[in-house]
């Protein structure tokens, strides 16, 4: 029977460390600032942004929300980003995705100053991650590595399989595992004999977007299973990409949904914002 990795508890511990450091900086009149740009009225995005704001303020950081209508021009949005790039009170900039179809996400990400790119999506930060240089790492992959390490497992020398190859989770988490000296396979919808490939993993990260996709025949006994999914099952109940009840019998450690990877994402955003501020102040 697998042990549950408590993402809520770990996220709280990391947030407490960030909050303590922010309080120390306040004593020398320094305050990290995070700006979030929200375009349109997507309810899921709005809820997520509200959570980010609340957690930013709880950590003692400056929190700025800029709301723009769905019809805003790409040019206007890029102007807003450029203004934030030159604002000395803002150290992290995040444009909430997805954006309306008439706006190029790529152009927006490229416009964010890479030293304020706390989402870790700018090509410079992506490149630095892939050559093993210190960079801003996308928040979910960064959180996943912390979750794996919290089990006391040494990643070096382990066999890791990542199911999913998105630029936001799959590819960066695979690279982070490689940087930790794991032997990494990236699997996806075209991978042949997927259960057999997955079953070789000491560490299995699942980011398919398919509810309860991974069953126990995918699991090597004792493996660490990280479920990145946020889906709904046939009863409209929140679930992950892993069939938790089926897999927990085989896994050594497993993240639940909710309460696993999710809470870590915003916490790592705060850690990235603190890191950005310290870099800009040349305090690293």
From Swiss-Prot:
One of its GO terms (cellular component) is cytosol. InterPro entries: Aminoacid_DH-like_N_sf, NAD(P)-bd_dom_sf, THF_DH/CycHdrlase, THF_DH/CycHdrlase_cat_dom, THF_DH/CycHdrlase_CS, THF_DH/CycHdrlase_NAD-bd_dom. Keywords: Amino-acid biosynthesis, Histidine biosynthesis, Hydrolase, Methionine biosynthesis, Multifunctional enzyme, NADP, One-carbon metabolism, Oxidoreductase, Purine biosynthesis. One of its GO terms (molecular function) is methenyltetrahydrofolate cyclohydrolase activity. PROSITE patterns: THF_DHG_CYH_1, THF_DHG_CYH_2. CDD domains: NAD_bind_m-THF_DH_Cyclohyd. NADP(+) binds at residues 164-166, 189. It catalyses: (6R)-5,10-methylene-5,6,7,8-tetrahydrofolate + NADP(+) = (6R)-5,10-methenyltetrahydrofolate + NADPH; (6R)-5,10-methenyltetrahydrofolate + H2O = (6R)-10-formyltetrahydrofolate + H(+). Pathway: One-carbon metabolism; tetrahydrofolate interconversion. It holds the Pfam family THF_DHG_CYH_C. GO terms for biological process: L-histidine biosynthetic process; methionine biosynthetic process; purine nucleotide biosynthetic process; tetrahydrofolate interconversion. Its EC number is 1.5.1.5, 3.5.4.9. PANTHER family: C-1-TETRAHYDROFOLATE SYNTHASE, CYTOPLASMIC (PTHR48099:SF5), C-1-TETRAHYDROFOLATE SYNTHASE, CYTOPLASMIC-RELATED (PTHR48099). Homodimer. Catalyzes the oxidation of 5,10-methylenetetrahydrofolate to 5,10-methenyltetrahydrofolate and then the hydrolysis of 5,10-methenyltetrahydrofolate to 10-formyltetrahydrofolate. Belongs to the tetrahydrofolate dehydrogenase/cyclohydrolase family. NCBIfam families: PRK10792.1, PRK14170.1, PRK14186.1, PRK14188.1. This is Bifunctional protein FolD. It comes from Listeria welshimeri serovar 6b (strain ATCC 35897 / DSM 20650 / CCUG 15529 / CIP 8149 / NCTC 11857 / SLCC 5334 / V8). The gene is folD.
């Amino acid at each position: 029977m697998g042990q549950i990795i408590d993402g809520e508890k770990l996220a709280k511990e990391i947030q407490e460390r960030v909050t303590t450091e922010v309080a120390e900086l306040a004593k020398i009149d320094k305050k990290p600032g995070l700006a979030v740009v929200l375009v349109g009225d997507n309810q899921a995005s709005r809820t997520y942004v509200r959570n980010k704001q609340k957690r930013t303020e709880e950590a003692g950081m400056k929190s700025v929300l800029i709301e723009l209508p769905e019809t805003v021009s790409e040019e206007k949005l890029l102007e807003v980003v450029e203004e934030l790039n030159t604002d000395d009170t803002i150290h992290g900039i995040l444009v909430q995705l997805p954006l309306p179809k008439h706006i190029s996400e790529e152009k927006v990400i490229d416009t964010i100053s890479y030293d304020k790119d706390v989402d870790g999506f700018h090509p410079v930060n992506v490149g630095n991650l892939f050559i093993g240089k210190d960079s801003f790492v996308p928040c979910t992959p960064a959180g996943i590595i912390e979750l794996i390490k919290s089990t006391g497992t040494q990643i070096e020398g382990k066999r890791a399989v990542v199911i999913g190859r998105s630029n936001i989770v799959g590819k960066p988490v695979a690279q982070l595992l490689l940087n930790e000296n794991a032997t990494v396979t990236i699997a996806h919808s075209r991978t042949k004999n997927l259960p057999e490939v997955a079953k070789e993993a000491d560490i299995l990260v699942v980011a398919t977007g398919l509810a309860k996709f991974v069953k126990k025949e995918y699991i090597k006994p004792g493996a660490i299973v990280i479920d990145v999914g946020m889906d709904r099952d046939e009863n409209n109940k929140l679930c992950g990409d892993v069939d938790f009840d089926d897999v927990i019998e085989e896994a050594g450690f497993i993240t639940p949904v909710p309460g696993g990877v999710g809470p870590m994402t915003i916490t790592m955003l705060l850690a990235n914002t603190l890191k950005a501020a310290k870099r800009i102040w040349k305090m690293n």
